[in-house]
Amino acid sequence: MHILDTVDAASLRTDVPQFRAGDTLKVHVNIIEGKNSRVQVFQGFVLGRQGDGIRETFTVRKVSFGVGVERTFPVHSPIIDKIEVVTKGDVRRAKLYYMRALRGKAAKIKEKRDFSTAK
């Protein structure tokens, strides 16, 4: 297993920011259509993270024109250009699957307040 660990370590990304369930992210994804390639931004909140190491994935959910859209990304995928954390969410669960059934104001995630800078 040590050989597999070294191969996996070579493929790990180092530019992944710290984020967890409830955080709002902008995921910049490279889309290749024929010979053209472009960057598409997928913005939504993180439902949860799964796995560990090279196999780690995270699921992002957004509501587009009244329809919920979820997309699962591998954290260390080469098609991800960059990941930006827009806001930190204040939630008490690691997986937010219950958010799929909520609508309107009930589906809002409270923003985490930072008390370390205030004196």
From Swiss-Prot:
UniProt keyword 4Fe-4S, yes or no: no
GO terms for MF: structural constituent of ribosome
InterPro entries referenced in this protein's UniProt entry, alphabetically: Ribosomal_bL19, Ribosomal_bL19_CS, Ribosomal_bL19_sf, Translation_prot_SH3-like_sf
Entry superkingdom: Bacteria
Keywords, ordered alphabetically: Ribonucleoprotein, Ribosomal protein
Biological process per Gene Ontology, one example term: translation
Keyword Ribonucleoprotein in annotation: yes
GO cellular component, one term: cytosolic large ribosomal subunit
PANTHER family: LARGE RIBOSOMAL SUBUNIT PROTEIN BL19M (PTHR15680:SF9), RIBOSOMAL PROTEIN L19 (PTHR15680)
Described function: This protein is located at the 30S-50S ribosomal subunit interface and may play a role in the structure and function of the aminoacyl-tRNA binding site.
Similarity annotation: Belongs to the bacterial ribosomal protein bL19 family.
Protein name: Large ribosomal subunit protein bL19
Gene source species: Arthrobacter sp. (strain FB24)
